[in-house]
Each structure stands twice: as structure tokens, then as C-alpha cells.
Amino acid sequence: MTQSIMRYKDFFSEKTQFANFKTPLTLEFGGTLPEYRVAYRSWGKLNKSGDNAILICHALTGSADADIWWAPLFGEGKTFDETKDFIVCSNVLGSCYGTTGPASINPETGKRFGPDFPSFTIRDMVRVQRSLLNALGVKKLKMVIGGSLGGMQALEWCAMYPDFVETQVTIASSGKHSAWCIGLSEAQRQAICADENWNGGHYTPENPPKNGLSAARMIAMCTYRTRASFETRFARSLRAKETFNVESYLLYQGEKLVERFDANAYVKLTQAMDKHDLSRNRGDYYNVLKSIDIPSLIVAINSDILYPQEEQEELVRFMPNAQFGMLYSQHGHDTFLIEMEALNKLVMAFQKQLPPEGKFLNDRSPIVSTIFGSKLGV
């Protein structure tokens, strides 16, 4: 049977815009891209002073279409209000939704980069985002916000360009990737490598390592949720005579990802996450955290097994101008993509108490949102 060729452009909005940069990009670990492209979406208008911009940073397999995957946070009077702000979300370096990555054509060879795409880091992602914002005329970020991988980017923005960022929100993330997360990422990569079509990453577009990438996604989905959420949703219910509903759910999630994502991009992006460490080449980790004095909201999820609450508490303890936010839910890491109304209320509560530019938060007491079924209190 003939395999269909992956068309990643079918999985991001027709409203996506592109910025092309013809100058070489030297990456943190020494690799170079001769040129690069950034896919992005924007909402609202940039003001004359260029300082009403908000940057949204997406997670691992996300796209620039934040108005789709974070839709409840958009609208007048909400976190992302395009009547007041200029909101930007760009696809990260190394992804496959329009920004240069392993699935892109190498202009020097005329072929896909594939596994030869150079190693990159969260800092490289942020540098590419800065290039985009410069091209758009942004002079200062009113806020940078992201969850998971997006939160890593938000923190790096504070460390790399502190004078460019007014406030930041980090959700379900950490200042450095733990051995636990690195191990789980490697298990997923090994699942991809075990696919007979992997071929060291030199697979053809017609025959990608679908089984391996699907298995990787199934592993990941188990870490994005919790035992309690699986028990509540599936328990031991059957889909068919010998198939549990939870098995069917995981198979479906795996199949969905292989239709929309590139395996090499998945490998490279998870490796970039594993390299995440705010203190790399900057000195003592805690001193680095102490140096980040931008007004910050650090949001934890009580049931997150990937980035547990103590990691966010540590950030708040050492960052001198940070406030702690908590989402209570049984959904685990994915809560920030599920309980979005609650997240919107948390961020808005933080925004309402922000001090004048350059000042410290007057109130660092935690902001808490409790979610049980349809009940919500802030």
C-alpha cells in the first residue's frame, strides 16, 4: 500500500505568516544554519512605541496557532486581548509547522535536513524569536508566557534579555530539566529509533517511522496525565472484547501525532528540552535565579508528575520578584491545556496587581485556582 507523504502545512493555519532571515544563524553548540524561516501568527496591532507586545511560547508538538489551542484565553477582557495588545506566537526553531527544522529543505543540499539538522537549545529558540520580534518592530515585551517547553522559553527570555521583558508567566515548567524528565524523553526517543523505518533518521517522507513515533507519543501521554485521571476516565472499561478503553485511547493519540508531526523534529526538540539549564555557562544555579527580578508568575499543577510542584516552588523561593500560582486538578501536566478558563483567571489576577514598570510586586502571596469537575474558585 502506498504511504501518503506528510504535508505538515496542512496542520497549521492558513493565516500563518512567515519571516525569512537570509543571514547565517550560529547556534549555541556551534552548528550553523545558512538561513532560516520563522512561522508565526499575530493578533491585534503594535502601538507606536512598540511596547504592547505579548509573546506566547508553545509546548513540544504545538504550533503558532495559539488562538486554537489556548482559545479560552483570547478575547476582550481576557489574558490575550487584541483590542489592547499585539499578540505574537511563533513556531519554535526545530519544529515542523513552518519554522526551519529537520523536515525543512537544506538550501545547501536541496534535500531535507533530517538527522543532520544541527543541535540547538532553548536559547537558540529564544534568539530566533528575538529576531522575529525585531523584524516586527517590537521594542519591548509586555509579557512572555508559556507552558512546559514554552515555560522554559519564558524563563530564558528573562535570563537572556531582561531589559526587553516587562513581565513573564511560566506554567508547569522548571529552570533545568531533571534526570526524571531526561530519562522519560530518552525512552520515547528509543521507541522511535526501534522502528524499522527509522534508518538513523534518514527515512523517506513516504515511509516515516510511524510505529516508533506513535509509541513515543503513547509513553508521553501517560506522563501528561495521572493515574487518577485514567482511573476516572477509563477504569477497566472495555472498548472491545479484549481491548481496554485506555489502550484504544493511547493508540488513537499515537496515530494522531504521526499524521501531523515529524519524528526527527520530535527527537531534536526533546533533546533541546533535556539541555535546558538556566545556569549553563552562567555560574551557580541559585544565583542565576536570584538575578531574575522581572515580575513573574510561576504556575504549578498539583498533580503534575513531569514538573512537580516543588520545582516551581524553588523558582519562586529564589526569584526575588516572583509570585506562585497553583492549579488544582487531577489531569496532571496537561492541565494547562485542559482547564484553560482557570488558567486565564490566574494570569489575569496576576496582571491586575502588577506594579509600575521596574517595581517589585507588593503582594507575593499565592494565587490559587481549584478545579473539581465544573467547580471553579479563584
UniProtKB/Swiss-Prot annotation:
GO cellular component, one term: cytoplasm
Active site (catalytic residues): S148, D304, H333
Function, as annotated: Transfers an acetyl group from acetyl-CoA to L-homoserine, forming acetyl-L-homoserine.
Chief site of localization: cytoplasm
InterPro entries in the record: AB_hydrolase_1, AB_hydrolase_fold, HAT_MetX-like
Pathway(s) per entry: Amino-acid biosynthesis; L-methionine biosynthesis via de novo pathway; O-acetyl-L-homoserine from L-homoserine: step 1/1
Keyword annotations of the record: Acyltransferase, Amino-acid biosynthesis, Cytoplasm, Methionine biosynthesis, Transferase
Catalysed reactions listed for this entry: L-homoserine + acetyl-CoA = O-acetyl-L-homoserine + CoA
Enzyme class label: transferase
Highest taxon, organism lineage: Bacteria
GO biological process: homoserine metabolic process; methionine biosynthetic process
Domain AB hydrolase-1: 52-337
Pfam families: Abhydrolase_1 (PF00561)
Organism: Chloroherpeton thalassium (strain ATCC 35110 / GB-78)
Binding-site positions, substrate: R217, D334
MF GO annotations: homoserine O-acetyltransferase activity
Lineage summary: Bacteria, Pseudomonadati, Chlorobiota, Chlorobiia, Chlorobiales
Family: Belongs to the AB hydrolase superfamily. MetX family.
Subcellular location, record wording: Cytoplasm
Subunit structure, as described in the record: Homodimer.
PANTHER family in the cross-refs: HOMOSERINE O-ACETYLTRANSFERASE
HAMAP family from the UniProt entry: MetX_acyltransf
UniProt keyword annotation of Transcription present: no
UniProt-recorded name of the protein: Homoserine O-acetyltransferase
